[in-house]
C-alpha cells in the first residue's frame, strides 16, 4: 500500500502522504481489485503459503478502506492453507483499535508494529509523529485482541543516537516481549 501518514526523513520506499490521496482511495482500491482478480486467475494452481501486505503503511488507510482491502484478499485468494499472513501495521500513529479489530476479523497471523526507536527525541527528529507511549498503547491493544505473533522493527544508526540510546530502545522493547524483532541498519539511499 503506497501511502503513509507522512514521509519519514530516512525512508527510501516510494510512498505518498495519505492526506493528499484520500479522495483517490476508492479508485486505488478498484485498480488493486482488478490486479488481485488477474493475479488470482493467473496463479489458480499455485498454492501460496504466504500473504504479506506492506507499504508504505497499510494502516494509513481508514477503517473502511482497510476492511475493503482485507475483504478483497479473502475474496480472491485462498487463505485457508496459509502458513503466514502478515500485515505491516506500521507506525503507531496510524494504528487504531478499530483497525486492529478489522485485522483480527481476517485470518491474519502476524502483524508488525514498527517503532524504529524508543527514544522520543529521535522520533521527533526523523519525522515520526507518534509518542513512545503510543507504541505501548497499540502493542497492548494488539495483545488484548489476541494477536499472538507480533513483530517490531527497529533501525540502528538513526541520527544522533548513541549506544546508550540503542540500549534504552532494546530494554524497552524487551519489556514488551514481541514475538519477533527485525533490526535494520540505517541506509540512506534514493527512493526505490
Protein language model regions, located:
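Local cysteine-cluster metal-coordination motifs and their immediate loop/turn environment
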Residues: 2-15
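Conserved non-cysteine loop/helix-boundary elements of the Radical SAM core domain that shape
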Residues: 15-42, 46-192
Amino acid at each position: 500500500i503506497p501511502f503513509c501518514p507522512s514521509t519519514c526523513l530516512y525512508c527510501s520506499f516510494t510512498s505518498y502522504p495519505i492526506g493528499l490521496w484520500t479522495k483517490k482511495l476508492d479508485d486505488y482500491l478498484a485498480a488493486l481489485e482488478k490486479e488481485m482478480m488477474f493475479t488470482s486467475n493467473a496463479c489458480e494452481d499455485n498454492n501460496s503459503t504466504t500473504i504479506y501486505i506492506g507499504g508504505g503503511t497499510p494502516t494509513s488507510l481508514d477503517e473502511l478502506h482497510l476492511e475493503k482491502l482485507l475483504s478483497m484478499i479473502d475474496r480472491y485468494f485462498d487463505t485457508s492453507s496459509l502458513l503466514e499472513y502478515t500485515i505491516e501495521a506500521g507506525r503507531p500513529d496510524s494504528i487504531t483499535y478499530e483497525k486492529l479489530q478489522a485485522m483480527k476479523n481476517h485470518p491474519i497471523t502476524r502483524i508488525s508494529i514498527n517503532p524504529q526507536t524508543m527514544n522520543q527525541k529521535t522520533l521527533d527528529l526523523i519525522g515520526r509523529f507518534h509518542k513512545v507511549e503510543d507504541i505501548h498503547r497499540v502493542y497492548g491493544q494488539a495483545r488484548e485482541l489476541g494477536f499472538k505473533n507480533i513483530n517490531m522493527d527497529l533501525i540502528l544508526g538513526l541520527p544522533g543516537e548513541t549506544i546508550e540510546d540503542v540500549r534504552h530502545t532494546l530494554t524497552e522493547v524487551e519489556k514488551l516481549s514481541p514475538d519477533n524483532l527485525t533490526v535494520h541498519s540505517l541506509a540512506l539511499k534514493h527512493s526505490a
